[in-house]
Amino acid sequence: MTPLNIAVAGSTGRMGRAIMETIAEADDLRLSAALEQPGNPYLSQDAGSLTGTPPGVAISSDYVSALAGSDILVDFTRPAGTLSHLATCRKLGVRMVIGTTGFSPEEKDIIRNAAQDIAIVLAPNMSVGVNLLFRLLEVAAKALPEGYDVEIIEAHHRHKVDAPSGTALRMGEVIAQAQSRDLEKVAIYGREGNTGERRADTIGFSTIRGGDIVGDHTALFAGIGERLEITHKASSRKTFAAGALHAARFLMTRKSGLFDMQDVLGLR
C-alpha cells in the first residue's frame, strides 16, 4: 500500500513535533515535508533531529515546492499563517487538516469558500475524547430542565495565545444550539467587580493559563441541590496528533467539502 504523503506546518512547535512523531510510528503515512516560516532557527536542519525519528526530511520554508509532493497538509499554526497556506493548498489541490484556533467569522468564511475546491477538516480539537464530549454535552443540554446554570472552565499551558480556547467555544456553541440559544448573545467571558445576579440564560467562560497544562475542559451544569460536571483532560499532545492523522486518512476519500471531527468519527 502506498503511504500518504503528509506535510506538517509549524513543524518545530509542540504540536508539529507530536504529529511528526506519530507519522513515524504509522506504516501507512510518510512525512513528505516539515515546514516553518522564514527566519525560523531550525530551517535546513533535519526534522528527525527534533523528534528522535529517522532522518530524511529537512525543515523548509518553501511551501509551494514542499506541497507539490504532498497529499495533505496538517496545520496547527496561527490564523494568518493558516490562511496563507490554505491559498497555496487550494492552488495545488492539496487537502488540509486544520487544527488552528482563533479564526474570526470572516476567516472561517474564507475556509468554507476554499472547501469548494479541496477537502478540509477544520476542528478546534482533534481528540476522540473531546469530540465524544461534544456529543455528551448536546445530550445533557437537551435533557436537563430549565434552571441549570451553565459554566465552561478551560485550562492550558502558559504559551497559549488565544482565550477562551477553540474547544471551550465549541462546547458553548454545542450547548447553546441544543437549547435554541445564540451564543454571541448569552456568552459571558470572565467576571469582575459588582456584576449583579447571574442571568439565567447566560453561558459563562473561565480561562486558566499556567505551567505545561496540555488541555483541561469542564462543562458545569449547576442546578438547585445538584450539579453535573462533564470533563475532559488531555495528558499528551499525542492524542491530538493521532486524531489529526485519522482526519488525514478520512480526507483521502473526499475530493472537496468542509468537515469536522464529528464527520471523521462517524458521530453525525
Curated annotation (Swiss-Prot):
GO biological process, one term: lysine biosynthetic process via diaminopimelate
Binding site for NAD(+): 10-15, 36, 99-101, 123-126
Family according to the record: Belongs to the DapB family.
Keywords carried by this UniProt record: Amino-acid biosynthesis, Cytoplasm, Diaminopimelate biosynthesis, Lysine biosynthesis, NAD, NADP, Oxidoreductase
InterPro entries registered for this protein in UniProt: DapB_C (IPR022663), DapB_N (IPR000846), DapB_N_CS (IPR022664), DHDPR_bac (IPR023940), NAD(P)-bd_dom_sf (IPR036291)
SUPFAM superfamilies listed in its UniProt record: Glyceraldehyde-3-phosphate dehydrogenase-like, C-terminal domain, NAD(P)-binding Rossmann-fold domains
Active site location: 156 (proton donor/acceptor), 160 (proton donor)
GO cellular component, as recorded: cytosol
Species this protein is from: Nitrosomonas europaea (strain ATCC 19718 / CIP 103999 / KCTC 2705 / NBRC 14298)
HAMAP family per UniProt: DapB
Catalytic activity: (S)-2,3,4,5-tetrahydrodipicolinate + NAD(+) + H2O = (2S,4S)-4-hydroxy-2,3,4,5-tetrahydrodipicolinate + NADH + H(+); (S)-2,3,4,5-tetrahydrodipicolinate + NADP(+) + H2O = (2S,4S)-4-hydroxy-2,3,4,5-tetrahydrodipicolinate + NADPH + H(+)
Chief location: cytoplasm
Pfam families in the record: DapB_C (PF05173), DapB_N (PF01113)
Protein's name according to its UniProt entry: 4-hydroxy-tetrahydrodipicolinate reductase
Annotated compartments: Cytoplasm
Gene: dapB
